[in-house]
Amino acid sequence: METKENIVLFDFDGTLIHADSFLKFARKVCGLPRFCCVMLVHLPMLVMMCLRLTPRDVAKQRLFSAFFKGMDVERFRQLGRDFAQDVDGWIRRAVYECAQDARKQGKDVYVVTASIEDWVRPWCEKQGFLCVGTRAEVDAGGHLTGLFVGRNCRADEKVRRISEMLPKPRSCYHVLAYGDSEGDRELLAWADEGILISCL
């Protein structure tokens, strides 16, 4: 019997780190006054989201547009690289050590996240992790449109994206996955071993 290749998947926000990286990044980039103004304007929508009357993906895209639409993509990516320096302060140590142990054992470690790749990937590259996340759309002039390329990378989209990225059929892998929320359940179910983080 052929030995299966081991891969390990981690959610980012709430799993590898304690923080919500979207809000942390938006606050850092936009400054506190503008951040608070945008959040206040969108408060009714956020309440509707919490009541499950507005889809989470719709709310996220509208917030992303309010914060970043029209920004030069190279500036956005540089801000993402700068942001990577902040992430270490929010690490969930026990989970992070699991990821590093897997990498040291020669396993491919993927961070599969609903957060935007441009601010997660730079940190992942520093750690030796691969990154699969939500992608920001860029117009012909090199500016953010405020939309996403494809769907927000959560729930079943996480499974679709990681399946698309793997070079071999799913049956060739033994998959261990870590997540913390409803948006990770499909990924955890797809894995051979799914670990729902609670108090690590």
Specify the residue positions occupied by each region the protein language model found:
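Active-site neighborhood of HAD-like aspartate-dependent phosphohydrolases
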Residues: 1-52
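A general boundary/transition motif marking the beginning of the first structured unit of a protein
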Residues: 13, 51-52, 64-68, 87, ...
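Metal-dependent phosphoesterase signature
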Residues: 59-94
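Conserved alpha/beta cores of soluble small-molecule-handling proteins
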Residues: 32-35, 51-55, 73-75, 93-96, ...
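Cysteine/selenocysteine-centered motifs that mediate thiol-based redox chemistry or coordinate metal-sulfur cofactors
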Residues: 47-59, 63
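A broad detector of the eukaryotic-type serine/threonine protein kinase catalytic domain
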Residues: 27-30, 81, 149
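Short hydrophobic/aromatic-rich motifs at helix boundaries and adjacent loops
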Residues: 16, 32-36, 67-72, 89-93, ...
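C-terminal cap/substrate-recognition subdomain and adjoining C-terminal extension
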Residues: 1-5, 78, 85-200
